[in-house]
């Protein structure tokens, strides 16, 4: 279940259609591509396929008198989420001619079958596979994309917060890879990397939250001892950035930094709030 929650942390099943329901513009209710490259999509599909099989195999070890409880509390949530991801991501690939629409439709049919089984058990008739009949839960229209998938980013180095050097407090279960950590105001964390490039983009990913003891959420970023650049990432309720943070479960700040010389470099992040 840890992996199930980790994948849902990155993107909840109900957000996989890249739709919104609070907007007045009906365009937000049209299923569309997520801003993911093909490799990211296929990796996530593989991770969910593995989860689907694992939770099904575990069912064989559950006593008969607990089969229904296991299915309702564990197997259905995991397998339905897996098929929801398979449906949405296969459809995205199909819009680009990279997958078969029949496979996306088959994933929808699988959710239907899983839900039918759920509704024959202890909590008979309780589960609705398409709350409010929202577009994200339906079979997706067979349409062609009007723009290509984004290219995979060129990553020089990648870390979780817990990989850094500093006075960090690990936050179990938070972060895309479960490696988030907290910095108290005034504390710093550093990371080392190697590159011969003249500049780089440092992308800092935070758990989206709101200010508590001050009006802002700020940190500074410095590379190779350069003057620190101050960045803030607080948002306001229902702002566009707030909405994106909720959907992605991340607050992101990108900063272009010059790299002096070649070889090894050090990034230092210091919390201000």
Which residues are covered by each model-predicted region?
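Substrate-binding groove of N-acetylhexosamine-processing glycoside hydrolases
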Residues: 1-164, 197-201
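Extracytoplasmic
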Residues: 127, 131-273
């Amino acid at each position: 279940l840890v992996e199930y929650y980790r994948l849902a942390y990155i993107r909840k099943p109900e957000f996989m259609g890249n739709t919104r329901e609070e907007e007045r513009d009906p365009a937000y209710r049209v299923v569309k591509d997520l801003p993911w490259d093909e490799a990211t999509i296929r990796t996530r599909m593989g991770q969910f396929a593995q989860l689907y099989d694992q939770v099904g195999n575990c069912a064989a070890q559950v006593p008969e008198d607990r089969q229904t409880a296991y299915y309702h509390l564990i197997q259905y949530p995991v397998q339905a989420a897996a098929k929801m991801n398979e449906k949405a991501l296969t459809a995205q690939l199909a819009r680009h001619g990279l997958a078969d629409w029949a496979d996306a439709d088959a994933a929808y049919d699988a959710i239907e079958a899983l839900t039918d089984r759920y509704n024959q058990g202890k909590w008979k008739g309780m589960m609705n596979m398409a709350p409010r009949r929202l577009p994200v839960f339906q079979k997706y229209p067979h349409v062609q994309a009007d723009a290509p998938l984004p290219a995979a980013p060129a990553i020089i180095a990648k870390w979780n917060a817990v990989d850094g050097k500093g006075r960090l407090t690990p936050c179990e279960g938070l972060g895309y890879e479960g490696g988030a950590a907290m910095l108290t105001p005034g504390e710093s964390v550093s990371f080392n990397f190697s590159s011969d490039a003249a500049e780089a983009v440092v992308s800092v990913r935070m758990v989206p939250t709101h200010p508590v003891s001050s009006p802002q959420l700020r940190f500074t970023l410095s590379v190779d001892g350069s003057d620190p650049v101050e960045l803030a990432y607080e948002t306001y309720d229902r702002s566009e950035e707030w909405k994106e943070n909720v959907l992605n479960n991340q607050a992101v700040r990108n900063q272009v930094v010059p790299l002096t010389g070649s070889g090894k470099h050090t990034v230092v992040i210091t919390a201000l709030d």
